[in-house]
Amino acid sequence: MAATTTMATLNLPSLTSHPNSSTFPKHPQPLQFPFRTTTNPISLSSTRTTRLRPIAAVEAPEKIEQLGTQLSGLTLEEARVLVDWLQDKLGVSAASFAPAAAVAAPGAPADAAPAVEEKTEFDVSIDEVPSNARISVIKAVRALTSLGLKEAKELIEGLPKKLKEGVSKDDAEDAKKQLEDAGAKVSIV
């Protein structure tokens, strides 16, 4: 990039001129400002650019800076291909970095039986609806879900069917209670 100095002239009205005279003096006084700009030799227009490094910038070798510049210029598709290639080349997978990949706690014996995880997500399934309780069960299904009348009716016709999937234990128990109060036989899976 080539640095150039540009001189600009500003014509200002003279303060010594008579108040009744025109606003522009007969003899303008030039005022020159040096401007420093950087120009791109490829383009014909000049641009003014100021490049500052961040205060907390880490000094890195030239090779690392070039690599970082190349990586930041990748498209999302190119980045995905790069990740796949690195996983294959290095023999790692993204799943190995997941927090679910737990490590044995310090001080715990290595041969101890793993703790049984308590189930946190439940499915509510309607098993049976007596014919005399169909209307009240349809109302309960509509209250528990955002289904319309037709969809709720179709849901209770071909049983057993899951009403809710992946809900908390409290929500599952609440739904079961409401449906059983309406007359349906319900199970939580």
Curated annotation (Swiss-Prot):
Superkingdom of the organism of origin: Eukaryota
Region called Disordered, residue ranges: 1-30, 165-189
Cross-referenced SUPFAM superfamilies: ClpS-like (SSF54736), Ribosomal protein L7/12, oligomerisation (N-terminal) domain (SSF48300)
Pfam families: Ribosomal_L12, Ribosomal_L12_N
Start-end of Basic and acidic residues biased regions: 165-183
Matching CDD domains: Ribosomal_L7_L12
Keywords: Chloroplast, Plastid, Ribonucleoprotein, Ribosomal protein, RNA-binding, Transit peptide
GO biological process: translation
Location(s) in or outside the cell: Plastid, Chloroplast
Described function: Component of the chloroplast ribosome (chloro-ribosome), a dedicated translation machinery responsible for the synthesis of chloroplast genome-encoded proteins, including proteins of the transcription and translation machinery and components of the photosynthetic apparatus.
Complex and partners: Component of the chloroplast large ribosomal subunit (LSU). Mature 70S chloroplast ribosomes of higher plants consist of a small (30S) and a large (50S) subunit. The 30S small subunit contains 1 molecule of ribosomal RNA (16S rRNA) and 24 different proteins. The 50S large subunit contains 3 rRNA molecules (23S, 5S and 4.5S rRNA) and 33 different proteins.
NCBIfam families: L12
HAMAP family linked to this entry: Ribosomal_bL12
Protein name (Swiss-Prot/TrEMBL): Large ribosomal subunit protein bL12c
Species annotation: Spinacia oleracea (Spinach)
